[in-house]
């Protein structure tokens, strides 16, 4: 019987959550949940120089906001803790010593100066930088003497000199590498701390990880990982390597280069569920045409074999389209709650926000698009008379003056200032003048906003602004428009 599925998301707390990392978290979560398994959060903080204060909280908050809840982790514990790598430091050296005794690793006493000279020579010869095996077969007496004398050392993995090492990956299939191409990587550094690669393998084994999901940049390291598993006699996990997330055909998306993090996207007004939905499709293809999936639906349809081998190019337009679908599906009160902070950036006068939001929601793709649309509420914008010229509505600057002059007494007499009542009164006036509605209402929208495109038509804007402001703006515009000759 197969072991219960156990997956882990193991980020380093080095800043904001990159979208590629969040995609890895999603795929790792889906693999566990689809199989009824356990999803583990492990914090890999051994690179102390790159740690950013507060970054661990960002990891927690991001996963919670997107619904990727974990079963074991630093904050909730579990049977194989601690779940912070720096708190596990004492255990790694003994595993490396075990490999030394088995002849699968060795002490390396090379100084930094020797290694620098070696790499300079290799560079001059046009060779790839690699360790030359200088300490690989030292006599035991020499090793014992150096250890007794306190000579600094690292412990290196002893890669077989001949043969090939292969592994199977769910996405990339069977991969084989000549052992001669693999470097004797360092397992334990001179300060006694493990390297990332070594700690990763030991922790994954001790935590019972059955499926390792990570970026394809780790494909080249995987043969070394496998040799470590074999050296210990441990079961090798199932590997699922994901293609890189690219900014374009040449450049990887990278938070070091200032590319959007999850936090950046949310600050701009992308919804967490929409971002997650987009990341599902960033390098993974569902069956059929459906593209909008709830998290429960994602769990149900998940199949890692449908991950693409090709790099996934981040498509902002696709993300906007998915976000727009999520915004349209929100309950009205939820949209109002999310939109209010963005409305606050542009509007500082009293308006009917519920009506505004009812007009914004069907048109809104990203919440940060809202403020630039609303700059006319606080102050009357300068209006070019030519804005009133519209072939479809058959309007001109001169006809606009006639239309607004006809509308002014109608609106002054209006006691019910609801949108529908205002529209009905304007419609009746248009019929009485034997004009189409647009002939009257297009100039009204321009007069109230100074813009050709607004969140709602003229009667919507009038209802949002209120009667007093509507009449004031029409009066102001009438004073500036020339009459028809």
Language-model region placement:
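Active-site cores that bind ATP or allylic diphosphates and position pyrophosphate for catalysis
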Residues: 101, 106-241, 247-253, 261, ...
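Generic alpha-helical structural context detector
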Residues: 61-64, 97, 120, 230, ...
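Glycine- and acidic
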Residues: 7-13, 41-45, 207-212, 260, ...
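Residue-level signal for inorganic ion chemistry
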Residues: 18, 28, 59, 99, ...
